[in-house]
């Protein structure tokens, strides 16, 4: 099923879409309206189905978008959202990366790809790949993972990453 809701963060509207069955299968969002959100939903559905997840796009009302919004604005801790995630279609490595990031890097903090890789005895490139494939943005705070010399990449848009970090109170992201 899918549930879509809009919320305000200061001057910006965020539209959050949640794909779910018993638990959250995937999350996507847009600061650029419904049309861009639909593109993001299509990309998420393709990603999930390519990984064997059965997705039902029947619209259903749910409090899950509000949960994600409350995590975004800091009313609920990211790690408290982990229990709502299905982890369907993720590899054991990705699940470990997502859980470690969510539990260890708190709101208002950032970590480099290299630092997270060292923590997990992996490579920065493998961490970057896991971040790019993260089906649970905001709950699993991939926006908090930065390059050693700049903000780093972010799907769908780098300015989304900047906004999410600023919303959390991060002022600088270079060492």
Swiss-Prot record:
Protein name (database record): Methylated-DNA--protein-cysteine methyltransferase
Top class in the EC scheme: transferase
InterPro entries given in the database record: DNA_protcyst_Mta_Thcoc, MethylDNA_cys_MeTrfase_AS, MethylDNA_cys_MeTrfase_DNA-bd, MethylDNA_cys_MeTrfase_DNAb, MGMT_N, MGMT_N_sf, WH-like_DNA-bd_sf
GO biological process terms held by the UniProt record: DNA repair; methylation
Active site: 142
Entry GO terms, CC: cytoplasm
Pfam families cross-referenced by the UniProt entry: DNA_binding_1, MGMT_N
Biological role stated in the UniProt entry: Involved in the cellular defense against the biological effects of O6-methylguanine (O6-MeG) and O4-methylthymine (O4-MeT) in DNA. Repairs the methylated nucleobase in DNA by stoichiometrically transferring the methyl group to a cysteine residue in the enzyme. This is a suicide reaction: the enzyme is irreversibly inactivated.
Enzyme nomenclature, EC number: 2.1.1.63
A GO molecular function held by the record: methylated-DNA-[protein]-cysteine S-methyltransferase activity
Keyword annotations: Cytoplasm, DNA damage, DNA repair, Methyltransferase, Transferase
Location in or out of the cell: Cytoplasm
Organism field: Thermococcus sibiricus (strain DSM 12597 / MM 739)
Keyword Hydrolase: no
Extra facts: This enzyme catalyzes only one turnover and therefore is not strictly catalytic. According to one definition, an enzyme is a biocatalyst that acts repeatedly and over many reaction cycles.
PANTHER family: METHYLATED-DNA--PROTEIN-CYSTEINE METHYLTRANSFERASE
Family: Belongs to the MGMT family.
NCBIfam families recorded: DNA_protcyst_Mta_Thcoc, ogt, PRK03887.1
